[in-house]
Amino acid sequence: MREFNVADGEDWHANNAETSLMLAVAPELVRPQVARQADDPDRTAELVFSHPVNRTSTNGVTGTPSIASAAQGQRAFEWMVDDLCALIERGLRETPPLDHSYFSPVAP
């Protein structure tokens, strides 16, 4: 999933991944005619600090939203759901590192 997220930019604001995801889950919020002409190169790779998008992009986009598709977004959404479910399942099986009651003193 990470590779898809940042394939065209370390900052994935309005890049292929984010635009694809929006095309899959809320297409009415995407302006395809704008996205097709909005590609802007990533200027955030290897930066130490995060900067506001108006300091990293000429038009609010990072990467290549022009290649976005609902199909890519649907796959990304499924990956995200699978990852979240796996994390929840792992959390449900997890036990504390030390077997102490929440109400007992810290030291045994």
Give the label of every model feature segment.
Residues M1-P108:
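Extended, histidine- and acidic-residue-enriched regions that form the cofactor-binding/catalytic faces
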